[in-house]
């Protein structure tokens, strides 16, 4: 191997690391300014991720109704994770209202933790689930976003 080839490979690897770090930094910045649970299905994903990392792969089925679907299940985890479902209702269906910021710690669980992602394949939720090990809190939700991005 010539020294030129070695230098080119080193330069390519360095550029790849720099681009990857820049992209991860951009993702982290975006995740830190986007209000929690403002993304579509983010509460359901947060709850499913918390369940998967704690060994609850599917949960107990719920009959489909006006507010649930075939995919909905109750999961046997701390009910405080389920409070994430309450956050978006201050702006859903109200296009003129910006996303609100209700800290999870201020909400009271009204039912078992329910996720509309209950029957989705569990493996994809594992990375975000690692972030939920911080707990059912705003910091836990942000950690779940970050570990999902990795």
Report each predicted region and the residues it spans.
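Start-transfer (signal-anchor) and selected internal transmembrane alpha helices
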Residues: 1-28
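Conserved aromatic-histidine-acidic binding/catalytic patches
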Residues: 9, 13, 34-37, 115-119, ...
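Helix-to-loop transition at the C-terminal end of transmembrane segments
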Residues: 29-43
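Interfacial juxtamembrane loops and adjacent helix segments
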Residues: 56-142
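Selective detector of the "anchor" transmembrane alpha-helix that sits immediately C-terminal
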Residues: 140-150
